[in-house]
């Protein structure tokens, strides 16, 4: 039986997600499984392809299936996962997680249109050393319809996840869950400065992670830079 004290491995969480997705978790079981999510939220319905869900056809998308093996197995640093954390009144923060180290960057976002998103992302990515600028994986949100402009500006290729496949950005999804401790649902995210977002990112980057043998993301990233 699943109880409020039950803990799951990352693999088990993926399996639970599959049960939700396939409609196999109902009634009491669904409530119990929901309690296991760090944010205590119901199943996140993956964004569909309809424009009303913030999705639409993106020209010249490159599929995640074409992403290099070095990104898939996390062997080489510089491959990022990205998403938007959503708050009240259609406010957003860009969340970026480096796959090798789980290092997190947060980007203040005044608006969600693709011009604003691409410009904000490019500004932060260009500050990184060249070896940390290899690829970016995103879902099929229309905010990244300007991905070609982003690639030209940063020389970072964007790969798009399959529809309804949040586990293809698993590190980013997990980090967004951690961030809800600081930015609960219903929070107006526009009131936070970039300086404050940097402080929160630093807290996450200095937190030991089991998946890194209890090393911190900050330390892991420093190792690859020296």
Language model feature labels by segment:
Residues 31-72:
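Basic, flexible linker segments flanking DNA-binding modules
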Residues 130-144:
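Acidic/histidine-rich, metal-coordinating catalytic segments
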Residues 77-86:
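Two-metal-ion RNase H-like nuclease active-site motif
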Residues 8-25:
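Short, amphipathic alpha-helical "recognition" segments used to contact nucleic acids or chromatin
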Residues 16, 83, 96, 102, ...:
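Mobile genetic element proteins and their domesticated derivatives, centered on retroelements
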Residues 126, 141, 148-226:
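Charged alpha-helix within mobile-element recombinases
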Residues 72, 85-105:
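Short conserved beta-strand segments at catalytic cores or DNA/RNA-binding microdomains
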Residues 86-89, 106-130:
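Active-site beta-loop-alpha junctions of metal-dependent nucleic acid enzymes
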């Amino acid at each position: 039986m699943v109880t409020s004290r039950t803990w799951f491995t990352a693999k088990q969480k993926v399996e639970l997600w599959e049960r939700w997705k396939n409609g196999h978790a109902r009634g009491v079981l669904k409530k119990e499984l929901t309690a296991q999510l760090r944010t205590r939220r119901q199943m996140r319905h993956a964004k569909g392809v309809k424009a009303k869900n913030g999705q639409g056809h993106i020209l010249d998308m490159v599929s995640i299936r074409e992403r290099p093996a070095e990104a898939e197995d996390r062997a080489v640093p510089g491959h990022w996962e990205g998403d938007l954390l959503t708050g009240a009144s259609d406010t957003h923060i860009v969340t970026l997680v480096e796959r090798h180290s789980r290092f997190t960057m947060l980007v203040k976002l005044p608006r969600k249109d693709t011009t604003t998103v691409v410009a904000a992302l490019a500004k932060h990515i260009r500050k990184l050393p060249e070896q940390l600028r290899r690829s970016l994986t995103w879902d099929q949100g229309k905010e990244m319809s300007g991905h070609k402009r982003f690639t030209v500006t940063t020389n970072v290729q964007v790969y798009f996840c399959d529809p309804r496949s949040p586990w293809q950005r698993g590190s980013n999804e997990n980090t967004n869950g951690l961030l809800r401790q600081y930015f609960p649902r219903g929070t107006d995210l526009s009131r936070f400065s970039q300086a404050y977002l940097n402080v929160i990112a630093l807290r996450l980057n200095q937190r030991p992670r089991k998946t890194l043998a209890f090393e911190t993301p900050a330390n892991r990233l420093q190792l690859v830079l020296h």
